[in-house]
């Protein structure tokens, strides 16, 4: 499937196996498959994880940021593979 950029969650879900509540990409702004990617995550301040990290001083946990980076990298690699249909591991 040829994806044009920017693209949203429907196109992202066509490439990645991740789904809510653990899909941490909102859009891919730019991607040269196998080379580089620019992706974004819209952070909802109502996410339940902010209730405990940290109360009254919400911070997006670093592990979530790392997962978003891994998902973006996976998208870039898997998009380069085209219809091969393999799941990538970092």
Region spans (language model):
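Hydrophobic beta-strand-centered segment that forms part of the acyl-chain substrate-binding groove
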Residues: 2-6, 72-90
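Short amphipathic alpha-helical segments enriched in hydrophobics
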Residues: 16, 32, 47, 73-80
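Short aromatic-glycine motifs in intrinsically disordered, low-complexity regions
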Residues: 7-19, 81
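Compact, glycine-rich, soluble single-domain proteins
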Residues: 51-61, 65-75, 90
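Catalytic strand-loop segment that frames the active site of acyl-thioester-processing enzymes
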Residues: 20-60
């Amino acid at each position: 499937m040829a994806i044009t950029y920017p693209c949203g969650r429907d196109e992202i879900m066509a490439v990645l196996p991740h789904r809510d509540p653990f899909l941490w990409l909102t859009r891919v702004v730019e991607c040269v498959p196998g080379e580089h990617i620019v992706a974004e995550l819209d952070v909802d301040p109502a996410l339940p994880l902010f209730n405990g990290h940290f109360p009254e001083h919400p911070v997006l946990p670093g592990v979530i940021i790392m997962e978003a980076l891994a998902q973006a990298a996976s998208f870039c690699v898997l998009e380069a593979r085209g219809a091969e249909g393999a799941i990538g591991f970092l």
